Amino acid sequence: MAFIAALGLLMAGICPAVLCDGTLGRDTLSHEDHGKGRQLHSLTLASSNTDFALSLYKKLALRNPDKNVVFSPLSISAALTILSLGAKDSTMEEILEGLKFNLTEITEEEIHQGFGHLLQRLSQPEDQVEINTGSALFIDKEQPILSEFQEKTRALYQAEAFIADFKQPNEAKKLINDYVSNQTQGKIAELFSDLEERTSMVLVNYLLFKGKWKVPFNPNDTFESEFYLDEKRSVKVPMMKIKEVTTPYVRDEELSCSVLELKYTGNASALFILPDQGKMQQVESSLQPETLKKWKDSLIPRIINDLRMPKFSISTDYSLKEVLPELGIKKVFSQQADLSRITGTKDLYVSQVVHKAVLDVDETGTEATAATGVATVIRRQPRTLNFNRPFMVVITDMDSQSILFVAKITNPK
């Protein structure tokens, strides 16, 4: 299973650009900063990230109720948090509060140190699961950027920096798209379809996740089957299946849905939410951080006699400039934006926010291992789960409890 996402923030200049030498600063985190980052209560960061993820999901799903939804809240919030390093006063507050941080309980410094530490930890090489995340700044060769901003983005977020000539928009676009394509192993080949000549800076964040099921599906068992888009329409899809698998499961009668957890080798898991026929909107409207917590706390290892799930690859792209203001992030898109901690003057605002994501789900997995508690589970009535209608997926890093990706599959074909 692979999940790939990239987000680009495009900043345009209000005033004419001023010539600068373009030297890019570099620094590293001090031991003291590392300590502070680790001291940040991980639940505070995870709680805010979860709240933002579900709030954004509702906005995206509401705009296109019958369309697939795939996005990485972590990639989006990482880019916006980096942007907030360059923002001041109400512009900065809007960004961080829009990301669901309570600034009366957590300081800006703690947010950056905690977030930076989280992204560093996620990118540590691991044998069992591949998570690759990073950020890059593409700065116009004639745009003065404060060395303090460059140093902080490098020290806290390991953001790479490149000089671009936005007066040659096609060349600049190729530079950015080639970078993103390379970092996402070719899965996202074109993050930007066009750039404006007055672009001063582009901020990019990408996140690539590749996980192997702890209990894999056998490719020889995959067969063609119906996936019901609604009560009247269906499409043929390759359907994976596995029999007699023990995995965490809960039935939520109140919300009319079944919830199944499939674990990856390593420290990630996927929560699959299968609403009863016609109940997707009911489940979506009830989605809150408390709902996810209730499901996770209620999961119990159960024998699933017959589990069926479509094999698919879907991609989505969003312009978030219209969506983020609905979450309170408004000023940064206007000429009243104060991004003076980037340039020293109020000459920048955000003109585009582009997010693209790709989700691949297949049978791939390592050697199957029995789930904990198999011997203690009492078999009752046969339990079958058939994901042959719209469902949701939430992929979480278990160590930090951070949501990496959220998806709704309405049509896997």
Swiss-Prot record:
Superkingdom of source = Eukaryota
Q: Which organism is it from?
A: Rattus norvegicus (Rat)
GO biological-process terms attached to the record: response to cytokine
Q: Which residues form the signal peptide?
A: 1-28
- Compartment(s) of residence: Secreted
Upregulating conditions: By growth hormone. Reduced during acute inflammation.
Offer one Pfam family short name for this entry.
Serpin
Q: Please give the SMART domains that the UniProt record associates with this protein.
A: SERPIN
Q: How is it modified after translation?
A: N-glycosylated.
| Coiled coil (residue ranges) | none
Protein's recorded name: Serine protease inhibitor A3L
Q: Which family does it belong to?
A: Belongs to the serpin family.
Provide the domain comment.
The reactive center loop (RCL) extends out from the body of the protein and directs binding to the target protease. The protease cleaves the serpin at the reactive site within the RCL, establishing a covalent linkage between the serpin reactive site and the protease. The resulting inactive serpin-protease complex is highly stable. Variability within the reactive center loop (RCL) sequences of Serpina3 paralogs may determine target protease specificity.
GO MF:
serine-type endopeptidase inhibitor activity
Any one Gene Ontology cellular component term annotated for this protein = extracellular space
Keywords carried by this UniProt record: Glycoprotein, Phosphoprotein, Protease inhibitor, Secreted, Serine protease inhibitor, Signal
| Positions bearing the site annotation: Reactive bond | R379, R380
- Which residues carry the post-translational modification Phosphoserine, per the record? S30
